[in-house]
């Protein structure tokens, strides 16, 4: 679950 780390960038936060 990476979305929990980048909370606020669209879910995944990888973008």
UniProtKB/Swiss-Prot annotation:
Q: What's the EC number here?
A: 1.2.7.1, 1.2.7.7
Domain of life, per lineage: Archaea
The yes or no answer to whether the keyword Oxidoreductase is present is yes
What is a single molecular function from GO for this protein?
pyruvate synthase activity
Catalytic activity reads: 2 oxidized [2Fe-2S]-[ferredoxin] + pyruvate + CoA = 2 reduced [2Fe-2S]-[ferredoxin] + acetyl-CoA + CO2 + H(+); 3-methyl-2-oxobutanoate + 2 oxidized [2Fe-2S]-[ferredoxin] + CoA = 2-methylpropanoyl-CoA + 2 reduced [2Fe-2S]-[ferredoxin] + CO2 + H(+)
UniProt keyword terms in alphabetical order: Oxidoreductase
Q: How does it assemble?
A: Heterotetramer of one alpha, one beta, one delta and one gamma chain.
Task: Please give the name of this protein.
Answer: Pyruvate/ketoisovalerate oxidoreductases common subunit gamma
Its source organism is: Pyrococcus endeavori
What's the encoding gene here? porG
């Amino acid at each position: 679950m990476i979305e929990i780390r980048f909370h606020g960038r669209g879910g995944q936060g990888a973008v």
